[in-house]
Every structure is written in structure tokens, then in C-alpha cells.
From Swiss-Prot:
Chain residues that bind Mg(2+) 1: 248, 260
Organism field: Shewanella baltica (strain OS195)
Enzyme class: ligase
Protein name, as recorded: Probable alpha-L-glutamate ligase 2
GO MF terms, alphabetically ordered: ATP binding; metal ion binding; ribosomal S6-glutamic acid ligase activity
Gene Ontology BP, a term: translation
Keyword Oxidoreductase tagged: no
Positions of Mg(2+) 2 binding: 260, 262
PANTHER family: RIBOSOMAL PROTEIN BS6--L-GLUTAMATE LIGASE (PTHR21621:SF7), RIBOSOMAL PROTEIN S6 MODIFICATION PROTEIN (PTHR21621)
SUPFAM superfamilies xrefs: Glutathione synthetase ATP-binding domain-like (SSF56059)
EC number(s) stated in the UniProt entry for this protein: 6.3.2.-
Domain ATP-grasp: start-end pairs: 104-287
GO CC aspect terms: cytoplasm
Amino acid sequence: MKIGILSQFPQLYSTQRLVEACQSRGHEAVVINTLNCYMNINSIKPSIHYEGTELVGFDAIIPRIHASVTFYGCAVVRQFEMMGVYAANDSISIARSRDKLRALQLLSRKGIGMPVTGFANKPNDIPDLINMVGGAPLVIKLLEGTQGIGVVLAETKTAAESVIEAFLGLKANILVQEYIKESNGSDIRCFVVGDKVIASMKRQGPEGDFRSNLHLGGCGEVVKITAVERKMAIAAVKAMGLVVAGVDILRSNRGPLILEVNSAPGIEGIEQTTGISVTEPIVEYIEKMVSARKTNRPIIA
């Protein structure tokens, strides 16, 4: 097969590991900078051009769309889909998961546990908004934030009101979320491919920081997840319509809670922490799906 890896960062560990996994299974891997693609949108033969050449002959793509280019990245993935190319994560699912509010509403609709979350537009909604999620301490998140950036812990009601007023004053869209104190600044990252959790690790934030993102200095360790956590992670991925995803889970006094579903999860941290390859299962899944499409067999994930 000819597999395209959509990534702005060809030298990144995640990109290189995906290339290696494709090649080790006998496939041609082509790294494509998403932003350098341009599209011919028509009703007869839609196409994508790249650096002066039309992209042809691809069987599948693995989208690694950075959050900052979600709109254009999804347009490129959608164009590949129009050309009959299989996308490991399709454009609609990526867009769903990137919209934090919509993602939480989808989880809520499916009855999947998550922290109590509030969303508001007007400053005079603030006092009731804070009470709605259980009062301070609480977490305030920018809807557009990634990798722990734009996430603030407000220890008191006064601090919460000040931060919310400041964000809303800047016309920023925010979520207000209950703080799960018993998680102690840690979460569990599950790497899901299809209907399987391939690997999982516990991420612990640096001392004094409630955010556990490895990009912010957190550390990872191998963890054994429960059957409930495994089932919940898979259900969360299915709720988004994704195939490959990282699911972040908080352990709370009322059971596991889904914090986020990431459509382009980091690969380096979880592979180096667990010693498990997560890239080969991605390629194996693509092989199964492309083969089933060609033979019109029922697809069993």
C-alpha cells in the first residue's frame, strides 16, 4: 500500500515511528506537509496537489493534524476522502474531537462519565456558573487551548470570578470544570486503536502543578487500567467516531472520568514509558480496513 502521513513535522518522533511502521510491513510511506497541499474541488475528479505535483495512488492516510491548523487540515483530509482514500481518522471525527465543548456534549449524550462542566457567554452568569460545577477550587479552560496551555486552577471563588471575567472580557470561549482533587495532579493516558487499548500510562504533573501533560514537564509511568477504564476509553473514542486516539482519564472518588479525547495523540511519551509499539497496530488496522474496502467484506474492527 501507499500510505500518506499528514504531518507538518517530518522529523518528529511520532512521524518517524509511523514511517518505520509502514515500511516494516512492506508499505510505501510518504510524509505530506498538510499546509503545503492545495486542492482542486470539482464534481468530476477532485484532486490534491503538492509542491507542483498531483497526489495520486494513495490507499490510505494517517492524519496528524496539529490543533492550530484544524480547519485547513480537516479540509485536506476531507479532500482525500472524496478521492476514495481511507483516512485512519476521518475529517468529521477530527473536527468533533477538536471542539472541546461538542466533544463533552457527545460524551454526555452517551452517558460517559466526565467532570461536571459549565459553559457561559455573559459575565452576569458567573456566580451561578461557579456554583453549578460545585464551587471553588475549579478549573478554567480555554476552548482553543492544547497540551495544558490555557488551563487555570482557581483556588477560591474570588479568583475564579476574576479569571472568568478576564477571559470573557477578551471574548475568549472558556469551559469551567470541577476540580478532581483526589487525582493529585495525575491522569491516565490510554492509546486506543479501533476497539483496543494498545497501551496506557499514568502521567504525573511536576510538583505544584495540577496539569499532567508531558510537554509541561510531567512524567509517565506504566499503569494497569481497570476493565471499567478500558471500556470507557473505547466508548469515548467511538463517541467521537475516531479510530486512533489518546484518551485522558481521571480517577475520582465516583469512578473514572473522561477528561479529553485526542485525535493526534503523542507517540513518543507512551512508547518510551511502556515499551509498547503503538504505531504497528495503527498500520495493521489500516491494512484490515483497506483490504475490506477492496473486497467489500464486512468490516470487523
